[in-house]
């Protein structure tokens, strides 16, 4: 186990649909003490293996001067039952602010396992190992996993306090608050730790968000415990007081504008006859949010409208030649048809009229045979929609002998066209229609600057762009459009609001079944739909039943 493991950005990997999400909570015991005058200031780095290399995923906060830290930072991960997801936890004595770099930090030990092992055990404790597999003394790390797939809510809380006890001789207390959930076995699980407010007996702590699952295991009557401490830089925090409540009590008290609790120190209460409290803790704000799922929106009546855009540039080869990517063989569908049918048959189940807009680009089209980068392949500019995916297939096959393959490979016009439809939908202020643009192309786009600009604008709209690269061209430059490796920016430097592009080289999936192909190509769409409507704060139109006829009869 090495503390200086090489970390690289994982290349774009097409994920499979995830079975569930899990939260990981960490704590350590008996850490090595690397500081000569004080105790270690530990933090934990989480890494995940991707294609044989370790990718740094996240890092906990630093717990000052502690050899037995309990971290409040929660790692949320997608759990794939069918994959071996290798994880590495590395513990460091942190010098300076907790960032992504561990270069100047002292390695205290690490542990490798799989996410499946953690999930299966729910609570896993392992020894920490130094380099070459040596034990790091008696150091251990404990990882607790919780499934949050069924939870669709979170709460925003804001606490403040008044007239806290002064624990410092020459200044006022430096208070912070810890919120714990009481488990069924009586143990206490740290939910959140606030920041420290320096030199203040009437602190106002920053608001924070926490899932209902984390807060109370989605049981509103589960006991919660709040403790207030006076911060000590050496880790010997002074206890000010605590109180016990429930989330149900919090909500009721907040609604009645009586959300405050005596902060009580039990030792003082026993010793002092007139003791009342060590201050008062006030719940200044409580906001309960529901996080809607992809199926919430679909079952609420949101339609998925699919537009197909096909590359008719000359680099595909003469369709009359059997080597052409556009060659029609009645016994062996070409790559365009395979990708088109696999994706289209899934998408049409989410659109009540099952009509697809079918467009082409990069060809000379009749009657004047001028180059067009946005034409209806049914040659009806007034209505470019086809009946079902089979209608698109027929229009494609009928179109081939009527056009002259030409170029260049410009896709920005079609992205902008679909974006205009999505913009009209956005103005309705409802979660009623989401647009998917499926672009099938045999090469790198030639209008990259315009395409980046169009995608950045489209990232603000209810739409996603899926690009399938057919053939054996070098598609390396296309990865820039997929935001997995960083934030896509327009030529002017404007960042995309969200990642809406999924690029898939067909050759990596050509031996996959149509169902597997569709799952890979559409893997990111549910997340993108939820991200858009969540950002706009738009709930599903109807949670009680569907307003349209479409339904998830074949969920991707």
UniProtKB/Swiss-Prot annotation:
Gene name of this polypeptide: Cpne7
PROSITE patterns xrefs: C2 (PS50004), VWFA (PS50234)
Phenotype when changing residue 93 to N: Does not inhibit calcium-dependent translocation to the cell membrane
Free-text note on domains in this protein's UniProt record: The C2 domain 1 is not necessary for calcium-mediated translocation and association to the plasma membrane. The C2 domain 2 is necessary for calcium-mediated translocation and association to the plasma membrane.
Alphabetized UniProt keyword annotations: Calcium, Cell membrane, Cytoplasm, Membrane, Metal-binding, Nucleus, Repeat
Effect of residue 168 to N: Inhibits strongly calcium-dependent translocation to the cell membrane. Inhibits strongly calcium-dependent translocation to the cell membrane. Leads to the constitutive (calcium-independent) attachment to the cell membrane
One cellular component term from this protein's GO annotations in UniProt: synapse
Effect of residue 33 to N: Does not inhibit calcium-dependent translocation to the cell membrane
Residues reported in the UniProt entry to bind Ca(2+) 2: 168, 230, 232, 238
Name of this protein: Copine-7
All copies of domain VWFA, residue ranges: 305-504
Residue ranges constituting the C2 domain according to the UniProt record: 1-128, 135-262
Role summary: Calcium-dependent phospholipid-binding protein that may play a role in calcium-mediated intracellular processes.
InterPro entries for the chain: C2_dom, C2_domain_sf, C2B_Copine, Copine, Copine_C, VWF_A, vWFA_dom_sf
A single BP term in Gene Ontology: cellular response to calcium ion
GO molecular function per UniProt: calcium-dependent phospholipid binding; metal ion binding
Record family assignment: Belongs to the copine family.
UniProt-annotated stretches for the region Disordered: 536-556
Gene3D superfamilies, per the entry: C2 domain, von Willebrand factor, type A domain
Localization terms from the record: Cytoplasm; Nucleus; Cell membrane
Binding site for Ca(2+) 1: 168, 174, 230, 232
Pfam families reported for this sequence: C2, Copine
Cofactor: Ca(2+)
SMART domains membership: C2 (SM00239), VWA (SM00327)
SUPFAM superfamilies listed in its UniProt record: C2 domain (Calcium/lipid-binding domain, CaLB), vWA-like
């Amino acid at each position: 186990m090495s503390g200086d493991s090489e970390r690289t950005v994982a290349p774009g990997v097409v994920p499979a649909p995830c079975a569930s999400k899990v939260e990981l909570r960490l704590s350590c015991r008996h850490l090595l003490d690397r500081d000569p005058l004080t105790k270690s200031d530990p933090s934990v780095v989480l890494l995940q293996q991707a294609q044989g290399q370790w990718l740094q995923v996240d890092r906990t906060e630093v717990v000052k001067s502690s050899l037995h830290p309990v971290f409040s930072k929660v790692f949320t991960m997608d759990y794939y039952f069918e994959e071996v997801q290798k994880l590495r936890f590395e513990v460091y004595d942190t010098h300076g602010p907790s960032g992504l770099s561990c270069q100047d930090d002292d390695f205290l030990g690490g542990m490798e396992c799989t996410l499946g092992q953690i999930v299966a055990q729910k609570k896993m404790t392992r020894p920490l190992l130094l380099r070459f597999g040596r034990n790091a003394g008696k150091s251990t790390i404990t990882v607790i996993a919780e499934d949050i797939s069924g939870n669709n809510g979170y709460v925003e809380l804001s606490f403040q306090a008044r007239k806290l006890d002064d624990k410092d001789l020459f200044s006022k207390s430096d208070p912070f608050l810890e919120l714990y959930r009481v488990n069924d076995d009586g143990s206490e699980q740290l939910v959140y730790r606030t920041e420290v407010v320096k030199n203040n007996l009437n602190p106002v702590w920053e608001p924070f968000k926490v899932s209902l699952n984390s807060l109370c295991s989605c049981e509103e009557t589960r006991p919660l415990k709040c403790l207030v401490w006076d911060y000590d830089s050496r880790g010997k925090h002074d206890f000010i007081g605590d109180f016990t409540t429930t989330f149900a009590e919090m909500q009721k008290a907040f609604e009645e504008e009586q959300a405050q609790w005596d902060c009580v120190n039990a030792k003082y209460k026993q010793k002092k006859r007139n003791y009342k409290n060590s201050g008062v803790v006030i719940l200044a704000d409580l906001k309960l949010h529901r996080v809607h799922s992809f199926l919430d929106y679909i079952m609420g009546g949101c339609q998925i409208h699919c537009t197909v855009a096909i590359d008719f540039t000359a680099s595909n080869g003469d369709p009359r030649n059997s080597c052409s990517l556009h060659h029609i063989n009645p016994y062996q569908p070409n790559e365009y048809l395979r990708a088109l049918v696999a994706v289209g048959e899934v998408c049409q189940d989410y659109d009540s009229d099952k009509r697809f807009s079918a467009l082409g680009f990069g060809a000379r089209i009749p009657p004047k045979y001028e180059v067009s980068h946005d034409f209806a392949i049914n040659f009806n500019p007034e209505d470019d929609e086809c009946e079902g995916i089979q209608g698109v297939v027929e229009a494609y096959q009928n179109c081939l002998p009527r056009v002259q393959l030409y170029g260049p490979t410009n896709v920005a016009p079609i992205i902008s066209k679909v974006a205009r439809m999505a913009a009209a939908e956005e103005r309705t202020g409802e979660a009623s229609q989401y647009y998917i643009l499926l672009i099938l192309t045999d090469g790198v786009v030639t209008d990259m600057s315009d395409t980046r600009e169009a995608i950045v604008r489209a990232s603000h709209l209810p739409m996603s762009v899926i690009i399938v690269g057919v053939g054996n061209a070098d598609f390396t430059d296309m990865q820039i459009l997929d935001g997995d490796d960083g934030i896509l920016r327009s030529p002017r430097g404007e960042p995309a609001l969200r990642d809406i592009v999924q690029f898939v080289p067909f050759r990596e999936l050509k031996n996959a079944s149509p169902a597997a192909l569709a799952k890979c190509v559409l893997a990111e769409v549910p997340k993108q739909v939820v991200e858009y409507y969540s950002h706009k704060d738009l709930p599903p139109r109807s949670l009680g039943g569907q307003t349209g006829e479409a339904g998830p009869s074949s969920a991707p």
